[in-house]
Amino acid sequence: ALSKFYYVPGGPETVILALTETISKGTIMMPSEVSTNCDPASWEYPPVRSDLIQTIRDNLPSYDPITSATEGLGVTPEYFRTLPDVVRSNHPYLPIAIWGKNKIQIAQKQPLNLPYGINSPLDYLYKNNGKIIFLGTDYETCTALHYAESTINRPTETCLAATGIDEQGKTTWTEYQNVDLDSYDDFNDLGLAFENQYSEYFNQVRLNSSFVKVIEMKPL
């Protein structure tokens, strides 16, 4: 959310250069989800007319880690995933873009089912004492919290994602299992409670009208 900082000279390139210089020999991950790569019957903003659903199913571009743009995440994740030294995982709906140490191995291990759960990039982040960085954002958009949702045996639902093209030129779809990532709206409440009780596990600095926060993932 660079807009929260008013003006950053160089835009997302400046941000990424600062991160890579600071992290140096570590690993950086950013969400790079393709939020429309799902069954058009489930779209809500806006919903699809019933007579157009099958047409979209037959023609929606399937996921490509190189060409499929991120959606709804802002300019920084979109810029990050296009960099030549960044790899992107193959999950068709919830891929992660990764730079640095072990990036290929981390990307290759992301499972189709429960893509934010065990063996996912978030699992690697958790087990290696990773940190979460908020750049003008808050807990409402904290992707790392989905790791908790995915590892506490919550019920799953069947999802669809476009993954290829058949011999007739129509889009093919793949089913996978995932928890409902939108069923709870309490991430900010959880984050506020965490900061009030465990202030030793996060740091923040003000930058113009917003904050940069660094939070330890495992305690959160």
Where are these regions (language model features)?
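N-terminal and secondary-structure boundary signal
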Residues: A1-L220
